Amino acid sequence: MEIGLREWLIVIGIIVIAGILFDGWRRMRGGKGKLKFRLDRSLSNLPDEDTSAELLGPARVLDTHKEPQLDEHDLPSVSMPAREAREPRESGSKRGKRGGNGPAQGDLNLDLDLDGGPSFSSRDDDFVEPAAKSSPAVADKDQPQAEEVLVISVICRDPAGFKGPALLQNILESGLRFGEMDIFHRHESMAGNGEVLFSMANAVKPGIFDLDDIDHFSTPAVSFFLGLPGPRHPKQAFDVMVAAARKLSQELNGELKDDQRSVLTAQTIEHYRQRIVEFERRALTQKR
């Protein structure tokens, strides 16, 4: 039986396919050997455990930033029993302190004129503003009288004024605590400990807050004020006061005003800071 051209082509094709398969199988085996060889070389170059420990060094602990939080222990008690317990102790001292002379931090005469701003009352005498005038003193005898006062007022845009519960919650979050003269003070500690940095008074005479009736309380405006001399670090205390006033203004729909009843601007804030610097310079000069 003779083999034709077709049969030869089939045989040749089979041989070619077999050759291709064999070559591929050979390459695969060769590739596996090379891969294993490269892996072995890589592993042989790795440092031992002692060297690795020296290179890596000790583990580092990363500090994560956490916002300050207030717990129940930070908040002042506004319950009736606490109020009643405080009143007998303070009643006598208030009468004695209100007979003193010269203003001090946390106790300054109030005389806020809201002309040019929202009209809250037909009587200008109903409104008060911290000012360095003669007034009773509530601070200790060792505390110097305030020679200069930096004032930031927050006036409510709502004709109904700031509601007591919302106002109380806002200023407590800023670290202010109810204290002397029935107004709020910001101390060094958020818990109400340490020296007074600045204070906040009601803009309506007599300038106080009644925590017993806070649920029904409202006011058209409040005033933050910082007396000089006052805190040991007045510039830092002023920045904290600005932050508290801004927070109140932003969250309760208020408008910031300076001591001239003008809109509080970045330029005004910088001017306040310059007043602090100038006061500190004069104080250093007097000590010399």
Curated annotation (Swiss-Prot):
Which residue intervals make up region (Disordered)? 66-141
Q: Name one GO biological process term.
A: FtsZ-dependent cytokinesis
Cytoplasmic compartment spans? 23-288
Its localization reads: Cell inner membrane
User: What are the record keywords, sorted?
Assistant: Cell cycle, Cell division, Cell inner membrane, Cell membrane, Membrane, Transmembrane, Transmembrane helix
Q: Where is the composition biased (Low complexity)?
A: 106-117
Q: Which InterPro entries match?
A: Cell_div_ZipA, ZipA_FtsZ-bd_C, ZipA_FtsZ-bd_C_sf
Bias-annotated ranges (Basic and acidic residues): 66-75, 83-93
Asked if Isomerase is a keyword of the record, the answer is: no
- This protein's GO CC annotations: cell division site; plasma membrane
Residue ranges, Periplasmic side = 1
**Membrane topology term:** Single-pass type I membrane protein
Ranges in a coiled coil = none
The regions listed as transmembrane in this protein's record are 2-22
Query: Any keyword Cell wall biogenesis/degradation?
Result: no
Q: What does this protein do?
A: Essential cell division protein that stabilizes the FtsZ protofilaments by cross-linking them and that serves as a cytoplasmic membrane anchor for the Z ring. Also required for the recruitment to the septal ring of downstream cell division proteins.
Q: How does it assemble?
A: Interacts with FtsZ via their C-terminal domains.
* Membership in a protein family: Belongs to the ZipA family.
Protein name, UniProt field: Cell division protein ZipA
- Native species: Pseudomonas fluorescens (strain Pf0-1)
Lineage summary: Bacteria, Pseudomonadati, Pseudomonadota, Gammaproteobacteria, Pseudomonadales
The UniProt gene name for this protein comes to zipA
